[in-house]
């Protein structure tokens, strides 16, 4: 969260599921239901939208030192198989398009974090 804050990154792209074929693939680094504090940053989950091929989560991230806050949006692509590639690239292209559309819509100045 500190890296996102320092680089003014308000969009995170995640390309894996948490578990696949019974194995952990990624640690859940975000709070699911209640706010959590990570050093100086309080992360409040605001919303979660499940789409056909991805999940969009929105968080309010507050710097506890000065009270400033930002909205961070996490896009998790869920249609990528553990082995190989998706049957069609269309869903992934749509996903990337939505990420860029969101960046333009909300005027993010910092980089997209992957």
Curated annotation (Swiss-Prot):
It catalyses: O-phospho-L-tyrosyl-[protein] + H2O = L-tyrosyl-[protein] + phosphate. Signal peptide: none annotated. It is an enzyme of class 3 (hydrolase). InterPro entries: Prot-tyrosine_phosphatase-like, Protein-Tyr_Phosphatase, PTP_cat. Its EC number is 3.1.3.48. GO terms for molecular function: protein tyrosine phosphatase activity. Substrate binds at residue 82. It comes from the Eukaryota. Residues 1-114 form the Tyrosine-protein phosphatase domain. PANTHER family: RECEPTOR-TYPE TYROSINE-PROTEIN PHOSPHATASE (PTHR19134), TYROSINE-PROTEIN PHOSPHATASE 1 (PTHR19134:SF449). Belongs to the protein-tyrosine phosphatase family. This is Tyrosine-protein phosphatase 13. The lineage of its organism: Eukaryota, Metazoa, Chordata, Tunicata, Ascidiacea.
